[in-house]
UniProtKB/Swiss-Prot annotation:
Sections of the chain in a coiled coil: 256-287
Organism domain of life: Eukaryota
Topology class, membrane: Multi-pass membrane protein
Record organism: Mus musculus
Protein name: Limb region 1 protein
BP term (GO), one: embryonic digit morphogenesis
InterPro entries for the chain: LIMR, LMBR1-like_membr_prot
Cellular component GO terms held in the UniProt record: membrane
Topological domain ranges for the Extracellular compartment: 1-19, 84-110, 173-187, 313-339, 405-426
Family designation: Belongs to the LIMR family.
Gene: Lmbr1
Keywords linked to the UniProt accession: Coiled coil, Membrane, Receptor, Transmembrane, Transmembrane helix
Amino acid sequence: MEGQDEVSAREQHFHSQVRESTICFLLFAILYIVSYFIIIRYKRKSDEQEDEDAVVNRISLFLSTFTLAVSAGAVLLLPFSIISNEILLAFPHNYYIQWLNGSLIHGLWNLASLFSNLCLFVLMPFAFFFLESEGFAGLKKGIRARILETLVMLLLLALLILGMVWVASALIDSDAASMESLYDLWEFYLPYLYSCISLMGCLLLLLCTPVGLSRMFTVMGQLLVKPAILEDLDEQIYMITLEEEALQRRLHGLSSSVEYNVMELEQELENVKILKTKLERRKKASAWERNLVYPAVMVLLLIETSISVLLVACNILCLLVDETAMPKGTRGPGIGSASLSTFGFVGAALEIILIFYLMVSSVVGFYSLRFFGNFTPKKDDTTMTKIIGNCVSILVLSSALPVMSRTLGITRFDLLGDFGRFNWLGNFYIVLSYNLLFAIMTTLCLIRKFTSAVREELFKALGLHKLHLSDTSRDSETTKPSANGHQKAL
């Protein structure tokens, strides 16, 4: 009987492993397909050139798609775990959800951590160096020569990073950075390096998310139809039509030899056509879309932002009085044992919405920063080098999202796998400072956003607008140059 029980246990374990592997593969396949279509939408079509370059581009495209799929998996990791916990609580003995268990969720967290490290330290550097390589001088040109150069560059990069990490660990803890620890690469240096990358990602989120939370109002205002209050859309369309006709007459009147003026006028005409299309869309929009959807979305964004700041403020108070509020505190109950939200399923749904909202805001804020403005992908006009840079940036942001959500107290779900082993998560001063900075920066960005119009009028009244003390050009409506060269805002 004991032998049969042992065989039965081994068979059950084998079937569980096969089932979990199949589920993980199917989930990743879906994410990979979606990521592939996203990259193809932005990839420049002219990148497909010679046979050798075409092979290099295809390999780089495969690696970039893999990285973007891993990023999407890291974003979905925490929401999937939260909703799985609530489903297991609601249906603990349901036959159709036996595949959903703690082992599967732990496996997903471990795979996300493993693939994030693999993409960040191996695949993306390989894709970049492989794309830029030409082969060493004296060797026969071809794929093998480019692969050899790429591997040499990767080896040199690995030695450089290993040396920097060893020096950094020596400055922090001289005992940990002994010569014997050089042999402990997997257990010490790689987790330490990923912990540093995670901290950098959280700091980048700290910079991008408050900016994105304020920019979300502008972005949604550009996507939705605004109410036409005290505006005559027919007159504006008539004016923009006259401007379009004037530009077309000027364009046809110029000789083809004046290439610079022709290109400038074509770009100006394209901008005018885009503005005309937006005005016609506003005119054709229904009264419900104009007068209800836009205010409702703005109020919803304001509520979500306010709830986020309120949760961070409550988390700051919890950190001051309760040490279990630390992200690296005591482990709570297992998955499916107890609800981690005070309001049950409704609270879990709110946490998931806020996590996605913070991720979207961080991406919007990332591309809104002037330093990363050139990284913004354009449809059918993004080079593979820029795609690789965008994939790395999204990977860093998405990998740090679960850590940031737990650090800010957006959710109480414990970080699983390597995500919960970062050393800095146990530092009270770092965690408290992170929460304080997030709350202060978000509040200041929102105040700056909603008082920009008042500041502009005040600067104009005082005659200070010529000094460019207020930078609201990114949030205001874009002014279009008219046919006579003067600026005209519609």
